[in-house]
Amino acid sequence: DPLCENWVLSADDDRLYLIDWEYAGMNDGIWDLADVSIEGVFTPENDELLLTEYLGSKPDQNEYKHFLANKIYVDYLWTLWAKTRVPYDGQPMEDWAVERYARLKDNLRLFAEA
């Protein structure tokens, strides 16, 4: 979850670390990259650069599909979460759920084509 509260600057090496105690325990690290991509509205070129930096080499087809799958999982989770919030938060949350679901469907198409 790339909220600003989840970034930590190391005093030792001036590197930024993304932490998220909600999901970090037993989750795939690619989940966090997928979430950064989604929340940052990354382009395919941004995604490739992010994955290349993380993996240390250009992602192969399986690595890219794994990343796309995680983008789908992220939007699925937040679509369901938003739908549960509609009775309490109203139309803005419904709109957010619809936006997430539309992107999920777009990424399903990209996954099938990859």
List each model region and its residues.
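ATP/Mg2+ or Mg2+-diphosphate-binding catalytic cores
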Residues: 80-114
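Active-site acidic catalytic loop and adjacent metal/ATP-binding pocket
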Residues: 1-31
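Secondary-structure boundary/capping motif
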Residues: 40, 71, 99-103
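Short, isolated positions within intrinsically disordered regulatory regions of eukaryotic proteins
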Residues: 11, 25, 35, 82-85, ...
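Active-site activation/catalytic loop segments of kinase-like enzymes and analogous catalytic loops
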Residues: 30-59, 72-90
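ATP-dependent phospho-/nucleotidyl transfer catalytic cores
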Residues: 66-69
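An alpha-helical support segment within catalytic cores of ATP-dependent transferases
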Residues: 10-13, 52, 61, 103
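Short helix-capping and hinge/turn segments at secondary-structure transitions, especially at repeat
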Residues: 8, 38-42, 106
